[in-house]
């Protein structure tokens, strides 16, 4: 009997030792799996971040391309205004007037090709117009409508280059 008890104790000790040995191996495996999962998450985040950076860079490039002519258009607009004023002067010969109109039309066409267009001047919109004066409303010009335009406004695609300077009826 004592041999059986000793054998049982030895078997129990061996099983206990095996359990102790299995636990560290299993925890090392778990740690390795956790680290692998952590690295995979970091990789996925870094990959997503790179995609976001590329997307933002593409959007920025497209925006720059779309509005590349903004500065030039702002510099040309005063010349266009001067041509319009010159055409309003009385006493111009037909040849001079026709020449000025041709220059004006070519400038307007060049600006249109770049996406520059005149701001509508029907109903007053504080986002597009600058009210420099108000006048009482009449039958011809109801309230919140533009009675007179002092300077035309322009926008490049949906971006305002210059607000129209207007007289608004109230």
UniProtKB/Swiss-Prot annotation:
InterPro entries: GrpE (IPR000740), GrpE_coiled_coil (IPR013805), GrpE_head (IPR009012). The keyword Chaperone applies. Residues 10-22 have a biased composition (Acidic residues). It holds the Pfam family GrpE. GO terms for molecular function: adenyl-nucleotide exchange factor activity; protein homodimerization activity; protein-folding chaperone binding; unfolded protein binding. It comes from the Bacteria. Keywords: Chaperone, Cytoplasm, Stress response. CDD domains: GrpE. GO terms for cellular component: cytoplasm. One of its GO terms (biological process) is protein folding. Residues 1-29 are annotated as: Disordered. It is found in: Cytoplasm. Signal peptide: none annotated. Its main location: cytoplasm. Participates actively in the response to hyperosmotic and heat shock by preventing the aggregation of stress-denatured proteins, in association with DnaK and GrpE. It is the nucleotide exchange factor for DnaK and may function as a thermosensor. Unfolded proteins bind initially to DnaJ; upon interaction with the DnaJ-bound protein, DnaK hydrolyzes its bound ATP, resulting in the formation of a stable complex. GrpE releases ADP from DnaK; ATP binding to DnaK triggers the release of the substrate protein, thus completing the reaction cycle. Belongs to the GrpE family. Homodimer. NCBIfam families: PRK14140.1, PRK14156.1. This is Protein GrpE. It comes from Streptococcus suis (strain 05ZYH33).
